Amino acid sequence: MWRLKVGAESVGENDEKWLKSISNHLGRQVWEFCPDAGTQQQLLQVHKARKAFHDDRFHRKQSSDLFITIQYGKEVENGGKTAGVKLKEGEEVRKEAVESSLERALSFYSSIQTSDGNWASDLGGPMFLLPGLVIALYVTGVLNSVLSKHHRQEMCRYVYNHQNEDGGWGLHIEGPSTMFGSALNYVALRLLGEDANAGAMPKARAWILDHGGATGITSWGKLWLSVLGVYEWSGNNPLPPEFWLFPYFLPFHPGRMWCHCRMVYLPMSYLYGKRFVGPITPIVLSLRKELYAVPYHEIDWNKSRNTCAKEDLYYPHPKMQDILWGSLHHVYEPLFTRWPAKRLREKALQTAMQHIHYEDENTRYICLGPVNKVLNLLCCWVEDPYSDAFKLHLQRVHDYLWVAEDGMKMQGYNGSQLWDTAFSIQAIVSTKLVDNYGPTLRKAHDFVKSSQIQQDCPGDPNVWYRHIHKGAWPFSTRDHGWLISDCTAEGLKAALMLSKLPSETVGESLERNRLCDAVNVLLSLQNDNGGFASYELTRSYPWLELINPAETFGDIVIDYPYVECTSATMEALTLFKKLHPGHRTKEIDTAIVRAANFLENMQRTDGSWYGCWGVCFTYAGWFGIKGLVAAGRTYNNCLAIRKACDFLLSKELPGGGWGESYLSCQNKVYTNLEGNRPHLVNTAWVLMALIEAGQAERDPTPLHRAARLLINSQLENGDFPQQEIMGVFNKNCMITYAAYRNIFPIWALGEYCHRVLTE
């Protein structure tokens, strides 16, 4: 049976040498297969969960993270502390019913809190992450030593479970088939030991060939296939490492790009500059035959550089970009692969590796995200297969792996530990059941305090293109170490809220100087237009998207200001000023005014805001409204809030609640879920947004309908059902936040109970 190990418990006896940590591994989460673990009842539950997912896999794409529930001893059919409540349509929602629902929800949710104080949950969704890992481990010859047979079996289970009915795989688990998803996952299965004619492999191969073959894969896919040896480097558009030698004042210097963009293209440029290809094995030779509609030696690689299957083409290359890549390919690259210009190429490669090592060491070899994690691992092996850097990388592979009833996946980060915990604290506090769940809050409080980043990155931040970090919070763990603006804001809000509660219940408050450090970071992140981006200041211009080579993703080249990040920061600064007047008060006031103007400017004419990190208009609507309220705006004095309420109310479903499809993100048009079904997370976001805007004073009917939906949807054990995917990044790729299904219904019902049902 698979068991989740967290924190220091996740470190084996022989692992300590190759696992660096500045926090005693706080928040680390690793799944380990324990053959003797689990009772007969638990093993039966695991079998049932797997079978149920597989049988319904074409209709329900999300796992329910049932392995966590099973491990922590909460059976799905068991009730909480109080009996379940079901309200009839039109029945009055009484406070007792809400309190009963909340008690059951918190009884369940507190029971799955980890010993470190955070909540561990599925952060999967993208279907291109696992194949990259498999390819890198295969090329470096460590696939079977890093991944046990149980890991490999679960990975195959996952890939098969998320194969679409047409035989292909999507960009993410709910998406239609793409060449990027299909070719990479087909390759992953082959490298994991699947025979070319086993199971659904022929159907997958047919999809690939029927859609033109793997020459139509996106640029990221072309790179992975080139590394493996089943695609030629001459079929890639150039990624010259010399960009890292350019002066910083140039607007297209990599240091000015969004950190995820530059940290992915950094190792890609190294591999491209090296033209690295792994060992040509029998499987590689076979894949050269399996993936293409014409013989491998007859493929026109120059033409293939700009070939992209129409199913993948979310962001088509502008003509100017094709001309640029063509010039670099035909003129620049022939020069820089020969003496004397080759000496500059060698210097550029050395510079790239210096930046790779800096990133690795500052994240304890976790890295910013899963893509650059695996690419950096590969680069370290290419540089020196016997290096300590490579060995340190291998020990962090398992930080990204998550197993559930749908199999083992690679997550979009090393977890969402701090993010989910900060939200969970705010949700629990909203219920006013603090005395009942003091131990839960105390553990969560300790986790938040210990997760704060307490030092800046070493060295000159200008050399390594880093922002100040001291006082910030990360998305996941302190060992990961990258600051994010809204994570800092939510972490600060959670710490401030708990500081208002009795210390004997929730523990000692965070020291004032550390709160001030967080405020200093937030103030340093405001852009000229008043908005806040994600990781850093916006360092260049939107026109740089003209050179975005990733056909699958939108708005990736620079770090844009976001409604969500701006609103969260406004709330945190407002609460801080209220509780700690005197620290940079005038600057905080000015920042909030400028941020409010940014939110109003970002609002669309129909009253909506586009959400960049959640699905989509409901998510951004919640943030937009509460940000303006934090700035002192009200429904009566702010047209933007009135328009936002009108927009959200216009999307209410006939039976109550809201249900928004991920297609809203992709197409930038509000789209209901298929069949006009409500979604509990969307409903919770809108319920909180409308409460914040004073809807109860005008017409509470939509609020009552939403609350009734949440209560009636609760499961017998107090859990809430997992529904469609609710996270997004780069406009077009969805990501799972499994904890959201509990956090936001609890939070919304807490707000509803104490701000709407006042009697």
UniProtKB/Swiss-Prot annotation:
Domain of life: Eukaryota
UniProt keyword Lipid metabolism present: no
CC annotations in GO: lipid droplet
Any Pfam family matching the protein: SQHop_cyclase_C
EC number: 5.4.99.33, 5.4.99.-
Alphabetized UniProt keyword annotations: Isomerase, Repeat
MF-aspect GO terms: cucurbitadienol synthase activity
Range of residues in the leader sequence: none
Stored InterPro entries: SQ_cyclase_C, SQ_cyclase_N, Squalene_cyclase, Terpene_synthase_CS, Terpenoid_cyclase/PrenylTrfase
Entry annotated with the keyword Isomerase: yes
Record Gene3D superfamilies: 1.50.10.20
Pathway noted in the entry: Secondary metabolite biosynthesis; terpenoid biosynthesis
UniProt tissue specificity: Highly expressed in young fruits 15 days after anthesis (15-DAA). Also observed in roots.
Cited CDD domains: SQCY_1
GO annotation, biological process: triterpenoid biosynthetic process
Reactions listed under catalytic activity: (S)-2,3-epoxysqualene = cucurbitadienol; (3S,22S)-2,3:22,23-diepoxysqualene = (24S)-24,25-epoxycucurbitadienol
Statement on biotechnological application from the UniProt entry: C.sativus and L.esculentum expressing S.grosvenorii genes SgSQE1, SgCS, SgEPH2, SgP450, SgUGT269-1 and SgUGT289-3 accumulate siamenoside I and mogrosides III and V, thus providing a strategy for vegetable flavor improvement or for heterologous biosynthesis of mogrosides.
Function of the protein: Oxidosqualene cyclase involved in the biosynthesis of the highly oxygenated tetracyclic triterpenes mogrosides and cucurbitacins. Cucurbitacins have cytotoxic properties and exhibit deterrent taste as a defense barrier against herbivores. Mogrosides are nonsugar highly oxygenated compounds used as high-intensity zero-calorie sweeteners; they also possess pharmacological properties such as regulating immunity, lowering blood sugar and lipid levels, protecting the liver, and acting as antioxidants and antitumor agents. Converts oxidosqualene to cucurbitadienol.
Similarity section: Belongs to the terpene cyclase/mutase family.
PANTHER family: TERPENE CYCLASE/MUTASE FAMILY MEMBER, TERPENE CYCLASE_MUTASE FAMILY MEMBER
UniProt miscellaneous comment: Cucurbitadienol has anti-inflammation, anti-cancer activities, and acts as a precursor of traditional Chinese medicine active ingredients mogroside and cucurbitacin.
Protein name listed in UniProt: Cucurbitadienol synthase
